[in-house]
């Protein structure tokens, strides 16, 4: 039986691979989407160190996105837990990913 943590990471990785595909198709749109989410969260008073790291990546080194979105490093796994791409994947498709990851 898979642990909850392993299942959560598997689902997260699958969703972020879709974000990576979108990034390869329309990088500016994906970057803008992530920055807008970060800005909105900051305006609501939601903040954490990883959000600042995401902002740096999106603004200054977006070429790192593929490694973060689908990589297996500790940093990639950690950053995906605070991803600024919430809402990028349509809800119906997201639900399909969640149910097929069981």
What does each model-identified segment do?
Residues 1-102:
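Basic, alpha-helical nucleic-acid-binding regions used in initiation and control of genome expression
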């Amino acid at each position: 039986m898979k642990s909850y943590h392993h299942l959560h990471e598997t689902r997260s990785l699958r969703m972020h691979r879709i974000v990576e595909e979108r990034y390869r198709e329309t990088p500016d749109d994906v970057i803008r989407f992530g920055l807008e989410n970060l800005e909105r969260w900051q305006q609501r008073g939601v903040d954490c160190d990883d959000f600042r790291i995401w902002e740096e990546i999106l603004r200054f080194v977006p070429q790192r996105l593929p490694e973060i979105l689908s990589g297996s490093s500790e940093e990639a796994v950690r950053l995906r837990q605070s991803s600024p791409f919430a809402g990028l994947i349509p809800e119906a498709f997201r639900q399909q990913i969640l149910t097929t990851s069981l």
